């Protein structure tokens, strides 16, 4: 029997990592209700790989993670939405974990501990910093909400929530080119607590590999601090170039 979870994958030129991710999803028990890949105009084999895997493919009229994820959420039929990056591997019991967490009515959304990995190494320092950021970003910049259950989750943590709650707060802000996930967490928090699941998902270290670990963490910290004091996402985007 399948779960009530719709998995939504925003993608743009992800042929190098997508096959591995889709193969990983075939191991889920119970299987998701559906998997939707929302393509932002890929120029490689991303769409072909998704079609061969037998998953539903949506073509977004514009690229942009917020826009693509909202399009997937509108098309989804599951009662629960799970937003998965194309370079992230999840545990085989992902759907069971999600349904168990959201069975608690006081929890509105959740995510996982992201471990940044490559084929031959694990980025322990960056992964630990990202784990701490879930807590300290909320505590420092939104302390009144932290004590109401706010945790700041990012896309590589595989954010999930009820479809009803997602649309109650109008989904992802399509105007945000960056920090759309943190913004969503703040708006979702009005409906309940955000829960960090004590399980690991594995994300590609490709951005850290290109920037270097010190520079990457410095940029993450810089962007987070500026966002926390209200600097516009359009300005912050210049520091976070796309990496494939």
Which positions does each model-derived feature cover?
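Glycine-rich, basic loop-to-helix element that forms the pyrophosphate-binding segment
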Residues: 60-76
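A conserved acidic beta->alpha catalytic loop
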Residues: 39-47, 88
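Conserved donor NDP-sugar-binding/catalytic core segment of glycosyltransferases
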Residues: 93-125
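Short, flexible, basic/aromatic active-site loop/helix in glycosyltransferases
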Residues: 112-119, 128-152
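Acidic donor-binding loop at a coil-to-helix junction in glycosyltransferase catalytic cores
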Residues: 178-184
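Short, acidic, metal-binding catalytic loop of nucleotide-sugar glycosyltransferases
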Residues: 24-32
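Short aromatic/hydrophobic "clamp" motif used to bind/position activated sugar donors
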Residues: 81
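N-proximal low-complexity "stem/linker" segments adjacent to membrane-targeting elements
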Residues: 1-24
């Amino acid at each position: 029997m399948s779960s009530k979870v719709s998995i939504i994958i925003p993608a743009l030129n992800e042929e190098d990592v997508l096959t591995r991710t889709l193969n990983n999803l075939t191991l889920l028990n119970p299987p998701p209700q559906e998997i939707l890949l929302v393509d932002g105009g890929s120029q490689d084999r991303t769409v072909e790989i998704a079609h061969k895997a037998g998953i539903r493919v949506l073509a977004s009229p514009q690229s942009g993670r917020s826009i693509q994820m909202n399009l997937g959420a509108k098309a989804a039929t599951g009662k629960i939405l799970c937003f998965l990056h194309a370079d992230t591997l999840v545990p085989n019991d992902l759907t069971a974990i999600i349904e168990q967490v959201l069975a608690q009515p006081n929890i509105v959304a959740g995510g996982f501990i992201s471990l940044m990995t490559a084929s031959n190494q694990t980025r322990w320092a960056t992964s630990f910093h990202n784990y701490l950021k879930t807590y300290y970003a909320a505590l420092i910049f939104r302390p009144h909400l932290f004590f109401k259950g706010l945790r700041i989750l990012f896309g590589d943590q595989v954010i999930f929530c009820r479809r009803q709650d997602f649309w109650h707060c109008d989904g992802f802000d399509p105007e945000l080119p960056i920090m759309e996930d943190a913004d969503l967490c703040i708006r979702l928090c009005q409906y309940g607590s955000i829960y960090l699941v004590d399980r690991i998902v594995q994300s590609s270290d490709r951005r850290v590999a290109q920037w270097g670990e010190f520079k990457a963490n410095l940029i993450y910290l810089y962007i987070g601090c500026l966002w926390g004091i209200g600097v516009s996402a359009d300005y912050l985007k210049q520091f976070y170039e796309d990496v494939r």
